[in-house]
């Protein structure tokens, strides 16, 4: 299952997750996960955050806080966040992965909302492979 990660350093990357999701996504967000539904994020997308991020003193995630409208209620989103979709698995509501169209849609939304501040992380493995092909 693919998710879209936004770090507190304003870097964006795709990441592959396995079940149990609370463990694999938990590693990315740094602890217990909480699914939130920001008003500025269209359905069926959701944002997964660290449930105890404020208690742990994690840094503010500006993009997450903007989407969550933290300026209205004063509760910021902190730490790395993972975007996924909600859907149904075997008839039960669950978190499901993103496909390529979802990644393009969310990438465009994130770029627009952040004014271009959030950028795709550079894959050094990809760069090395490209250099090898050029030689």
Spell out what each predicted region is.
Residues 2-17, 21-24, 61:
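Feature detects long, helix-prone N-terminal segments enriched in hydrophobes
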Residues 74-84:
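Ubiquitin system architectures
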Residues 41-63:
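Short, structured protein-protein interaction patches enriched in aromatics and acidic/basic residues
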Residues 125-132:
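Conserved small/polar residues in nucleotide/adenosyl-binding loops
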